[in-house]
């Protein structure tokens, strides 16, 4: 009997492959860094071949290290950085342009024009999204316009579009399957989340030929099998979800009202709203949390573009630390009398502001400000932004009021300083799970659910285990003062935009 699920986690800065046991623990892991390219201000790209080669290499390495073969693998589950856009040749699988990464802002002017022309209401009603360069539609349009002959080839059916999951699936299956799942489709700004189908009006608006698009399937579904030459025998691919939705599944947030927040390069908080999509009045987005057996579960989502990236800035930009973990120690040494605020709008502000043109700033600097105060400001910025998201969720969903237990995951959740400060500023408990690889676990669970490797969601949820609960320790008046200082800083920046 197969003993593992092979989970592929293709992220913004690295690709990983992990073997997951039936009890949800990790048996083996392989990881490779993924280069990014910044051809101009606000532009972020990756080579499609780097994405593919790192994923394939990690899969082969993890199988070799564990001494297992295809017969030991029940299924493959894929999770991926969302919105990142690729267009490739169907005949060869070769991309016609570098992947345009979700952080890329080059289409901000196009988005502003569409908003000014009054298209925002239609897009919001059909997709649950706000018009923003973050999503895939304007990235696709840019590639079709920039690459000579691309539009004509797309209309002839010679090209294929996909987010990273779809591209990997195409390559893994030897070009036999061009498909995606409902969560990734819901991030394109082309997908009607109510009907569960590509929307002809939006395809016309963005100039995207239908022939370019992948088939949309459930998150737990039959996605084909790997080409036998890759691993020596075919391995079925049975699960797929965007990284944040996969983390929600891995956190067992299956009940309406449950909230998780993932801290990686960015920060993404999702609130399960059940089988009814909730239209946000506070500039959150409505998205598909997961789709199983044809039934869609929806979520309200707030997206923050800079979380762990702020720590990377301390390390790589300011050269203040050598390793990300040092930021905790440094922040703990900060002078509490200095109220330094960092608004890390390096690539604009995400939810609930959605201001792509705003840039970052520091407030409250004095002659005494040093590395410790800057480190604390970087970590607190993540907490402040999370508070903005949770407040918006409270206001949007009638079932969400009062203190919320927040389940956290992602690399930055390992920071005790940040998680404690998050609980302090939220005025609510923050729960860190024993298994922090929740994104991988979610992808593995979806694949395992499809083939009976894992139990139904209600039983799976009983296995969720707490590692530590952070409880608020900040006085109410101090919390209110700190949040007011943050919001004043944000308003100052927005007023200059």
From Swiss-Prot:
GO molecular function, one term: glycerol kinase activity
Cysteine disulfide links: none
Catalytic activity: glycerol + ATP = sn-glycerol 3-phosphate + ADP + H(+)
Residues engaged in binding ATP: 12-14, 265, 308, 312, 411
Mechanisms controlling activity: Inhibited by fructose 1,6-bisphosphate (FBP).
SUPFAM superfamilies in the cross-refs: Actin-like ATPase domain (SSF53067)
A single cellular component GO annotation: cytosol
GO biological process, one term: glycerol catabolic process
Pfam families according to UniProt: FGGY_C, FGGY_N
Binding site for sn-glycerol 3-phosphate: 12, 82-83, 134, 243
The keyword Nucleotide-binding is annotated on this UniProt entry: yes
Family membership noted in the UniProt record: Belongs to the FGGY kinase family.
Record's protein name: Glycerol kinase
Species: Xanthobacter autotrophicus (strain ATCC BAA-1158 / Py2)
